[in-house]
Amino acid sequence: LAINFISLTEALMFAQLFPLMDKMGFDPKDLFEVFEDSVLKNWTSTFYTKKYMDREYKLDFALALGTKDLSYVKRMYEEYNVPAFVLDGALDFCRVALAEQEKGQPPIDMSYPCETMYHLLGMK
């Protein structure tokens, strides 16, 4: 759960950033290269930012399962009665993206929140 908390939260941060930078005029391919050439490069960043660059969200890990894992971690914080600041935002983002999933359709990928952000920014 600890690894999923870190990696999924990182994926969600990139999912939020790519559409915003695109709206501001930065080419997603250039942004991808910036991260690939930075100290932030790791397996998670490469795997997810490639999806965000291409706006292709092939199912590799279901968003519903990632949300469930993050919810388990949230309960751990609640057991100690302390806030989970970053986690709360990540869970909110996941829930907004999950609401876009149409009933009866295949599961959406953990990368789909990027597309949700594009929708929120008015970019189809």
Predicted regions and their residues:
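Active-site/catalytic core of tyrosine-dependent DNA strand-transfer enzymes
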Residues: 120
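ATP-dependent carboxylate/acyl-activation modules
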Residues: 123-124
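Helical "substrate-binding/catalytic lid" subdomain
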Residues: 1-117
